Regions:
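Surface-exposed acidic/polar loop and edge beta-strand patches at domain peripheries
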Residues: 1-143
Length: 143
């Protein structure tokens, strides 16, 4: 059981992107990365004890940055799914969003949470529980 922090790669700005690998007492391992708070891999045993990665995830930072519209394991937002015509209304006020899926907005457009760098706010290795890595995303205007 434990948590390992290591450099996963570098983003297009040259910043280090870290991964955090957590292993429990049963040998199950998950890896999250700071870019998009992505769940990059989950390795667990099948009924025969053979371990395999059971989630889709990219192998490097560049693939997460470009993504080709695939949001493997990332946190999407501020909105998730499609917003028709890239606009919506709240209390009579119309809000317009970037069009990135034909005439629609998909998963917040080109600058959603999946493209943001999330920072670790807590790492906990409690011997009575599995490890915890807590990722935090603050709005730029609230730093």
């Amino acid at each position: 059981m434990g948590i390992i922090r290591e450099i996963f790669g570098h983003d297009s700005k040259g910043e280090n992107i870290y991964s955090y690998t957590i292993t429990n007492e049963s040998g199950m391992t998950i890896r999250v990365i700071e870019l998009g708070a992505a769940l990059q891999s989950v390795e667990t045993a099948d009924r025969n004890g053979k371990y395999a990665d059971v989630v889709l995830g990219y192998d490097n930072v560049k693939q997460y940055e470009t993504g080709n519209g695939e949001n493997f394991g990332v946190v999407v937002g501020r909105n998730a799914n499609r917003i028709k015509d890239a606009k919506f209304m709240i209390k009579g006020k119309e809000y317009r969003l970037a069009k990135n899926d034909g005439e629609n907005n998909l998963h917040s457009g080109p600058d959603g949470f999946e493209k943001k760098l999330w920072k670790v706010s807590e790492i906990s290795e409690d011997k009575n529980a599995d490890g915890t890595v807590r990722l935090l995303r603050m709005r730029e205007d609230r730093r």
